[in-house]
Amino acid sequence: MCEYLASQGYVVIASRSLGARAIVMTDDVEGVEAQAADIAFLVNGARSLPQADMDKVAVVGFSWGGLSNVFAAARSSRIKALVSLDGSIRFYEKIWSAAGDVRPARTAVPMLSLGAASLPFEELEQKKNRPVASYLNSMKYSDIYFGTMHPMQHGHFSSLYGFRLARDDEFGDYRRADVEQAYRAVALYVHRFLDAYLKQDDKAMAFLRQSPARNGIAPQVMAMRFQPAAATVPSEAGFLRAFAAAGYRDAQAIHARMREASADFALSPLNLNTLGYQLLGGKNARGAVELFKLATHIEPKYGNAWDSEGEAWEALGEKEQAIAAYEKAVAVDKNQLNAVARIKALRAGN
């Protein structure tokens, strides 16, 4: 696989599977964290290669590597695509669920999952008859391709040990030639997937979206199911679009809905204060009040946002609301000198 991708123009960097404290990998959180750290090291090291485009990074993982690459993607925005070759992300629910930062919103990148046919957990989950939860089915922010390679067993996804060094009687009900044919399909799909999502190749994308049979791969060799992204990750930009579409009203309600959709969604009170000032400068004081109120809803002790809200109320001619906002600014931060001055001025009728 590595040699093939390199022959297609990709810069390929690989490492072997090593445990945290020993050569042998352990199937626990410590083991996957160690391998995820190795991936992060390799990705960072690629920055020293002049031919490497760091805006187009993918991580391909076999077996345990098909779990640790998900951990790595959750912690690095550099990783733009994932490939799982019968990866352990399908089987080790207790491990990925124990990592608080490994969640769909943090791994919102396309994934190609090619696996053996023995345990189709993702389909079982959708039928509400699942032995374990499927992380892949929960990746609602990602395009996911589920490929099933019928002739292949787990070890066959490693070409060296899976079939090059295997005896002819180690292929179950299939022949060596059947497994080799399936492996060629695996390599081809990985190549096309990377071309589609890293190089934005339209022909490669069309290849992925049609059935394997249309691509010359027999149904007894491969089946493919495509699960398109069902939503976009809630973001500040998305919040602002929704806020504008709502007529610059209901900022707190929009924020609450987006928080409910994703626990990872967060807005910066500092940014909200800045954005509110931009609306205030654009003669949209009502919208500015909404953002200032949201800022103090998120951070009640943010005195500057209370002071900003006071200014917006003044722009609207709402004296009492302005005084109330300024008083809250001073209550949480005695250094809000503008608020102190405006309270005196407004009470004096100025």
Placement of each model-derived feature along the sequence:
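Alpha/beta-hydrolase-fold serine-hydrolase catalytic core, especially in secreted/extracellular enzymes
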Residues: 151-155, 160-303, 320, 324-327, ...
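Residue-level signature of tetratricopeptide-repeat
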Residues: 309, 316, 342-343
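The feature captures the conserved acid-bearing segment of alpha/beta-hydrolase catalytic domains
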Residues: 81-154
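Alpha/beta-hydrolase active-site loop
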Residues: 27-51
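Short beta-to-alpha linker loops that shape the active-site pocket of alpha/beta-hydrolase fold enzymes
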Residues: 11, 16-19, 88, 152
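Primarily recognizes the serine-hydrolase "nucleophile elbow" in alpha/beta-hydrolase
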Residues: 42-106
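Short amphipathic alpha-helix adjacent to the substrate-entry channel of hydrolases
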Residues: 1-14
